[in-house]
Amino acid sequence: MKLNDLSPAPGSRREKHRPGRGIGSGLGKTGGRGHKGQTSRSGGSIAPGFEGGQQPLHRRLPKFGFVSLKAMDRAEVRLSELAKVEGDVISVQSLKDANVINQHIQRVKIMLSGEVTRAVTIKGIAATKGARAAIEAAGGKFEE
């Protein structure tokens, strides 16, 4: 037996349908597309969300909300992510250098999630009450 002698077991694989290849195939002539009309043509599909001229759902519902521009330049950092920063002083720039936050971020807030394992000095970064208590309990301090 060689690789070129291998073949699947009889009846284990079905032939794929080839529309438009004779009436005996069951998909001859119109090829399962029906007679005339937009969807019988090649490329004849309607846009997603089109409802036949009826006012579409996304235009019937009211607009609401907005995207806050403040969210663009602010970020939240977990306590566990502070371990990625080398050095004892953690600032916004040191977080950027350690790839913890994106380069365009200007303000950061530390959240209580995870653990801080070493004493660090936080410089110019806000923190929640719980995060501040956890950092100070580990021997760290805050500088404005």
Curated annotation (Swiss-Prot):
Pfam families associated with the record: Ribosomal_L27A (PF00828)
Stretch list, region Disordered: 1-57
Annotated GO biological process: translation
Biased composition (Gly residues): 21-31
GO cellular component, one term: cytosolic large ribosomal subunit
Molecular function GO labels: rRNA binding; structural constituent of ribosome
Superkingdom of this protein's organism: Bacteria
Xref: HAMAP family: Ribosomal_uL15
Described function: Binds to the 23S rRNA.
Oligomer and partners: Part of the 50S ribosomal subunit.
Protein name in the entry: Large ribosomal subunit protein uL15
Native organism: Pseudomonas putida (strain ATCC 47054 / DSM 6125 / CFBP 8728 / NCIMB 11950 / KT2440)
